[in-house]
Amino acid sequence: MMSKLGVLLTICLLLFPLTALPMDGDEPANRPVERMQDNISSEQYPLFEKRRDCCTPPKKCKDRQCKPQRCCAGR
């Protein structure tokens, strides 16, 4: 009885992961072009500057998070 149960358990454990895993074509790692298109860039968000700790528009430069010496000096 125990050997039959062990065989059944082994079969179930071997079959379940094979059907539960996505196929190779469905994995986003295999589609770099689509992955790059989904990338969020600063061109889509005009209030975000690429420079770290910078804020726009200039009136926000008085915020504590903004670094005025780097961002607002030239404005």
Curated annotation (Swiss-Prot):
Gene Ontology CC annotation, any one = extracellular region
| Impact when changing R52A | 5-fold decrease in activity on Nav channels (probably Nav1.4/SCN4A) from rat diaphragm
Q: Which residues does the propeptide include?
A: 21-51
PTM entry text = Hydroxylated; hydroxylations improve the ability to block Nav1.4/SCN4A sodium channels but does not affect folding.
Q: Tell me which positions the record assigns to the signal sequence.
A: 1-20
Task: Tell me, in one coarse class, where this protein mainly resides.
Answer: secreted
Q: Which keywords does this Swiss-Prot/TrEMBL entry list?
A: Amidation, Cleavage on pair of basic residues, Disulfide bond, Hydroxylation, Ion channel impairing toxin, Neurotoxin, Secreted, Signal, Toxin, Voltage-gated sodium channel impairing toxin
Entry's Gene Ontology molecular function annotations:
sodium channel inhibitor activity; toxin activity
Cystine pairings recorded for this chain:
C54-C66, C55-C71, C61-C72
Question: Which subcellular locations apply to this protein?
Answer: Secreted
The annotated site for Important for binding sodium channel falls at: R64
Sequence positions bearing 4-hydroxyproline: P57, P58, P68
Against PROSITE patterns, the record matches this protein to: MU_CONOTOXIN
Q: Give the UniProt tissue specificity note.
A: Expressed by the venom duct.
Q: Which residues carry this modification: Alanine amide?
A: A73
Database matches in InterPro entries: Conotoxin_mu-typ (IPR008036)
Asked if Disulfide bond is a keyword of the record, the answer is: yes
Q: Name one Pfam family in it.
A: Mu-conotoxin
Q: Domain comment, in the record's words?
A: The cysteine framework is III (CC-C-C-CC).
What does the UniProt function comment say about this protein?
Mu-conotoxins block voltage-gated sodium channels (Nav). This toxin potently blocks rat Nav1.4/SCN4A (IC(50)= 19-110 nM). It also moderately blocks rNav1.1/SCN1A (Kd=260 nM), rNav1.2/SCN2A (IC(50)=2.7-17.8 uM), and mNav1.6/SCN8A (IC(50)=680 nM). The inhibition is reversible. In vivo, induces paralysis to an isolated skeletal muscle preparation from frog (cutaneous pectoralis) within a few minutes.
Family, per the entry? Belongs to the conotoxin M superfamily.
Query: Other remarks?
Result: Negative results: does not or only weakly blocks rNav1.3/SCN3A, rNav1.5/SCN5A, rNav1.7/SCN9A (IC(50)=6.0 uM and >100 uM), and rNav1.8/SCN10A.
Q: What is this protein called?
A: Mu-conotoxin GIIIA
